[in-house]
Amino acid sequence: MSLSNKTVKELRQLLKERYTVEDELTESIALSSMRFKPSQEPEFHALSQSSLLKTKLKQQSSTDIPSYTHVLISKLSCEKITHYAVRGGNIEIMGILMGFTLKDNIVVMDCFNLPVVGTETRVNAQLESYEYMVQYIDEMYNHNDGGDGRDYKGAKLNVVGWFHSHPGYDCWLSNIDIQTQDLNQRFQDPYVAIVVDPLKSLEDKILRMGAFRTIESKSDDNSATSYYELETIIFDSELNRALFETKLNLHCVIEDDESEQISLNRLIDSMKQYSYLMDSKNVRTRIKLATTSERVSNENKKNIDYQNRSTRSQFCLNTQRGDSTETSSFGSMFSGDNTSDVDMEDRNLTQFDSTDTSLCINGEPSIHVNRVERSSRSTDNFHNSKKRMNSNQEKCHDEGNDMLQRNVLETDYARAKNRILASKIKQYERLRFYKDTFTL
């Protein structure tokens, strides 16, 4: 497949049709194309970072406790929170919100994540997390001498809340979240809790985020803590707005060398496993052929032995029949003549005499031998047929397992190969786009 003659549009169509990747390669695209829903109220249309900072500096201190109804969050903070949550995947993440208050609004200017222990449904901040938070704030936000601290035009940033993720189960506060938020509101108010759902945000390409505060509701003698949602407004800097209006409508995908290397390792592992599967199958086939030939040889020996025994028994039977015939004829010589001087009626039988013929006496052992041989042969035939049946069942079972493993390995190989090809074609498509755009 030659790519040198294809245009950028054809390359993108090729990627869309043949190399559609459904995993981590599309996360950066979805994150960059995610839409932030703006507020529809006219009073918030002209919001900007500089106007909020100027209003903060002009604000007079008040002793009245405000009732917070809005959360103003910068686009930078939204992108950071979304990036942390998407990187966490199905595991919950947690972080701290930095900002200030403005009348009945909580303004979030920046944020940072915490090293926490998270699961799919819970996140716990240990002692090391709080130590990291104190050191980070002291290093990044508490420099007033023009050092490495972040400059927000004289406005001092404080901790105004925390954020965490709910992967796949929407934005709300659980019982543990309510207890944590209520404890923080009691000791370091103003404090707000922001919850983000990264999976639904990637699926819908709209930021799923909610801001919440707790309130103590009293009914009769029982007091219970509930929460309410604050309206969230996203603002941006004037510099970012100007850059957004003049930039090219192109989503630059950040290359992840580790994912490409992982796909290459998976491709190599699939090839090794497939080769091992074929070698083991050949070994089993050779062993079965050797076993089958040995069994056939043993059966041939048994057949030859049976034929020899049958021949010997038939020979003995014929011999015995000949002897009995001679004995009968010899007796008739004496009993058939009436002129014999021997009186047959007066003759007394001795203990050695017998009224039975030798044919009946000698015939019984040969019949018994034939019956035993027939029974032995039928038993051997039954065992041989049973062995052949078991062998056929084992053969079908082994063939089914081999086919299943082969299909799985072929699928893994094709998936890893498509990922690598998609990554390379994406790189070539961007280079081709830059060449066509900036070449005179």
UniProtKB/Swiss-Prot annotation:
Keywords, in A-Z order: Cytoplasm, Hydrolase, Metal-binding, Metalloprotease, Nucleus, Protease, Signalosome, Zinc
What InterPro entries is this protein classified in? JAMM/MPN+_dom, JAMM_MPN+_peptidase_M67A, MPN
Q: Where is the composition biased (Polar residues)?
A: 319-341
Q: Name one GO molecular function term.
A: metallopeptidase activity
Q: Domain MPN: where?
A: 71-218
* Highest taxon in the source lineage: Eukaryota
- Its biological function? Catalytic component of the COP9 signalosome (CSN) complex that acts as an regulator of the ubiquitin (Ubl) conjugation pathway by mediating the deneddylation of the cullin subunit of SCF-type E3 ubiquitin-protein ligase complexes. The CSN complex is involved in the regulation of the mating pheromone response.
The protein's assembly and partners: Component of a COP9 signalosome-like (CSN) complex, composed of at least RRI1/CSN5, CSN9, RRI2/CSN10, PCI8/CSN11, CSN12 and CSI1. Within this complex it probably interacts directly with CSN12. Also interacts with RPN5.
User: What name appears for this protein in its UniProt entry?
Assistant: COP9 signalosome complex subunit 5
